[in-house]
């Protein structure tokens, strides 16, 4: 992720502190350690700190501009926004908002899911992410190929820009054409966007 991170230097009394690495990933995590974690919300529940996205800080920016404006400013676009959509579902299935949002975005674009080369589907919780993946029929090989929010974190204020950036960099890395970025939003909403590599 180094190419996606702009290092921030903070001057302290002890000297410079450089923020240039995502601190959320835990490379030493094991299945055994995850299996021992206690449920977070209900005594007999299945959601634990190991299968839920982390609560962490983050910042991201994502510039959307008309191609001619970008060219005049001397910038080369990474991609073109093909379509986007928002949708809502009943509160009791609030994590499934990406399902209708994705279907609407695909329909607006005149594209199908199998045309997507990269899919970033934000993971609030494993159960939520699995439900979205199952209902939409997401290809596991194309979905969150470099880790999702459970592994990398879910800095709420920047998650949309964060996962869109990840998708575009991966699209360029593999030489793909289209990517889908989708996430649930509190209260039953979902959002999805489709980009085409420039």
What are the roles of these predicted feature ranges?
Residues 1-72, 135, 140-142:
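N-terminal extracellular/periplasmic Venus flytrap/periplasmic-binding protein-like
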Residues 3-10, 75-86, 114-123, 142-148, ...:
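Beta-strand segments within the central parallel beta-sheet cores of soluble alpha/beta enzyme folds
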Residues 12, 38-41, 85, 106-109, ...:
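Structural signal for hydrophobic packing residues in well-ordered secondary-structure cores
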Residues 16-21, 91-98, 123-141, 155-160, ...:
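Short glycine/threonine-rich loop-to-helix capping motif typified by GTGT followed
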Residues 25, 44-60, 82-108, 121, ...:
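Active-site pocket-shaping loop/turn-to-helix segments
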Residues 33-36, 101-104, 108, 131, ...:
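Alpha-helical scaffold segments in soluble metabolic enzymes
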Residues 48-65, 160-198:
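Conserved beta-strand-centric core segments of catalytic alpha/beta enzyme folds
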Residues 70-77, 103-117, 136-137:
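Phosphate/pyrophosphate-binding loops at sites that engage ATP/ADP/AMP, CoA/4′-phosphopantetheine
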């Amino acid at each position: 992720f180094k190419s996606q991170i702009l290092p921030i230097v903070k001057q302290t009394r002890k000297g410079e502190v450089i923020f240039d690495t995502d601190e959320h990933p835990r490379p030493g995590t094991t299945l055994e350690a995850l299996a021992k974690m206690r449920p977070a919300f209900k005594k007999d529940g299945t959601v634990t700190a190991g299968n839920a996205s982390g609560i962490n800080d983050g910042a991201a920016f994502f510039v959307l501009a008309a191609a001619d404006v970008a060219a005049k400013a001397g910038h080369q676009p990474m991609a073109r926004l093909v379509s986007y959509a928002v949708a809502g579902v009943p509160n009791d299935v609030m994590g499934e908002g990406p399902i209708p949002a994705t279907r609407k975005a695909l329909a607006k674009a005149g594209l199908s899911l199998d045309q997507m080369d990269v899919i970033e589907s934000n993971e609030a919780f494993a159960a939520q992410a699995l439900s979205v993946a199952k209902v939409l029929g997401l290809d596991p090989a194309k979905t969150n190929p470099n880790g999702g929010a459970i592994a990398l974190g879910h800095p709420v204020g920047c998650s949309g820009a964060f996962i869109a950036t990840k998708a575009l960099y991966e699209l360029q890395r593999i030489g793909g054409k289209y990517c889908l970025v989708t996430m649930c939003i509190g209260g039953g909403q979902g959002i999805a966007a489709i980009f085409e590599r420039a």
